[in-house]
Amino acid sequence: MARVLNVEIPNKKRAVISLTYIFGIGKTLASQILKDANVDENKKVESLSEEELTRIREEAKKYVTEGDLRREINLNIKRLMEIKSYRGIRHRKGLPVRGQCTQKNARTRKGPRKTIAGKKGK
C-alpha cells in the first residue's frame, strides 16, 4: 500500500479512485491532481513508479485535506454557534441546519424517538 498525505491508499485500484480514500479529495480533485502530476489516472497504484508517487504527493500537499480540513470544518461550526446565527443554533440543538422540515422527519439528526409518559391514546 502506497502512502499519500499519511493515508494508506489501496494498491489494487486505479490511481484516481485510490486518491479518493483521502478525506477532502473527491473524484474531480483526484483527476486534477493526477493531471497536474502528469500521471495517467487509469494506471493502478501498484504499477506507479516512486517518482510518480512523489509527484502525486507534492501536488496533493497543495490542498487542505485530512486533519486540517476536519479542524477547519469544526472551527467554522464552532464560530457559527458562538455568533448565535440561525445555523449555529440549529447545530447546538442537534436539528437539521439546511431548512428541512422536522415535524415528522429528521430522525437521523434528532436521534431515536424519546417516549413521553402520558402521551399514549391521544
UniProtKB/Swiss-Prot annotation:
- Assigned protein family: Belongs to the universal ribosomal protein uS13 family.
| Name this polypeptide is given | Small ribosomal subunit protein uS13
Q: Which UniProt keywords apply?
A: Ribonucleoprotein, Ribosomal protein, RNA-binding, rRNA-binding, tRNA-binding
Question: Which parts of the sequence are annotated with region: Disordered?
Answer: 94-122
The superkingdom of the source organism is Bacteria
Q: Where is the composition biased (Basic residues)?
A: 106-122
Q: Which InterPro entries match?
A: Rbsml_uS13_C, Ribosomal_uS13, Ribosomal_uS13-like_H2TH, Ribosomal_uS13_bac-type, Ribosomal_uS13_CS
